[in-house]
Amino acid sequence: MCLPRHPAVAYLFLVRPLSSHVSILRTQSVIRSPRQLDAVLVVGVTLLCIAAPLVATNAAIAAASGIVVLAVLAWFKRCPAAAPLSIFCVICLSLRFSGVRYGPVILAFGLLGYAGVVRIVSWLRRTATWARWGSFDASIRLLCVVAGLLSGAAVLSWYLFLHPNIPHFVKAYVPALPLGLLIVGGLIWAMLNAALEEAAYRGVFLHALDTSLGPGFPALLLQALAFGAIHIRGFPGGWPGVGLACIFGLFMGVIRRRAGGMFAPCIAHVFTDVVIAGIVLLLARPEV
């Protein structure tokens, strides 16, 4: 091919078409990058939330600081999945480090902050599409029953065969009241705790992961790991408790996706929490 010798002609012949192609590539990269950044931030926040309960205090503070940095970046870049998720996590971790130890209270305030953000901030409105009842047909009901029975049996087996030492748990959470009142309180706790944990992990976490990564297994696994990690000091606790809670989180995530809403996983979760309340009130209390 014969190239033009005059510089101006050469510019028009070669450089200008090339610059237009570069401009197109840059535009395409900018169009794609916000979603990619959103996914990276969501995964980063989730991984730090998984690590924070499992490591020493100094490392947990570092993980929390990392979440704050990612939250600032998510808000600066207006990431629709990472921004509300990071706010929820920052609120929960702030309460935890400030001395609040009761998990449902932490989750409740975190969810209130999340709800306020997605309602007030204009570019986040109508992003919390997970907050719906969903289906509860025969197949979903069967899944709930199977998941509830399996998880309840797993928790009971954990208590009966591993003989965990949980007097501190009973002393901290079970007041000195008549058994009848404790049973009523246990049922109320089971419903509230199930609703809060499902809203947090199958709602806030799974929704952010699904919308940024896509509704595949990685999103399902990450939310289950985050759910399992917070049970390191819960009931069931320790690493066996983390494993059981992680498997349970996978079950609940599948049910939430199949049902397309929150009612079904909440019902299945209540079954398991009723078993936990029964163990604490009827088997683990020193008075019994």
Locations of regions flagged by a protein language model:
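Juxtamembrane helix-loop-helix connectors linking adjacent transmembrane helices
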Residues: 106, 115, 120-193, 211, ...
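Acidic (Asp/Glu-rich) catalytic motifs at the cytosolic membrane interface
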Residues: 193-202
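Alpha-helical transmembrane segments and their cytosolic membrane-interface
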Residues: 22-64, 208, 212
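Alpha-helical transmembrane segments in multi-pass membrane proteins
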Residues: 52-123
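Functionally important transmembrane alpha-helices
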Residues: 195, 217-230, 234-288
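Membrane-interface starts of transmembrane alpha-helices
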Residues: 101-109, 181, 185, 211-223, ...
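Alpha-helical transmembrane segments
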Residues: 34-51, 83-92, 146-152, 220-223
